[in-house]
């Protein structure tokens, strides 16, 4: 924002003063080098300018990841041993690395690889040499053929043929494969119904992002409720110092995990409070964030979707929808905006990878 602030947009008077100096780069010379190029990072002035923001954000990231790691330790036994979730996505790397599984001797595997490689080669040649015929397998928009009201309210409706997606789909349980396309069609029918009834004049109707947010929160609540006995025993053991839990084979002791969560959460709270966010909003923000994290991790462990985006439905977006932005105030809105980078979408959310790593270690008898 410091780069693009102008007298016309009035950013300087509106919110720039609320951005912490220790988390941002303001030096015009350094910013010019970053945006325009023809410069180098390796000067004393540039390195010192970047040092504080990089170190501070690194501290924040490490605390965030550490809390997730401790949380996965608490969840692991309940989901892996008690509920016996399948972790569909760990099977492929385990089979690839196993000497006992004749993975690369499967003729159907090589036939599938040959088809995918042939398609990619043809498409690549078509891009480089347009005279080579290409295959019409990407982004056929059905909306181009549906022009009658209210059916044309479906909007962009792509049909694509991606071999890698078909291969990953083979790893997914049938109920997830079904729900993936069913709810896509259901969403499009919601748009048609809204157009038919005239509800499409309502901004953002039918509130798909909010529906998705509610679904993830529901998955989180279900996961916590189904493991309530296990989690209560962990808390009892933490507060009393004794219990019947056997955590000798866990990645870390349960008491250590709970204590680590508390310490990591304290670091996050102090950090964000220093940024300028109100105390109550800090707990709401991270409560929503970690609830979404648990929901995403549960879905990945049980069903294994390779992508779990949640655009515009993280706490940085949901909170201003639930609470009047004018009541939140500029300082809180600025800090929420600075949290956008790890809440834009959750396709590469680290917590599922952490739990899948524990599952792979268990299957491979590591640790």
Spans of model-derived segments:
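Long hydrophobic segments that form regular secondary structure
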Residues: 360-367
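Transmembrane-helix bundle segments that line or gate the permeation/cavity pathway
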Residues: 1-351
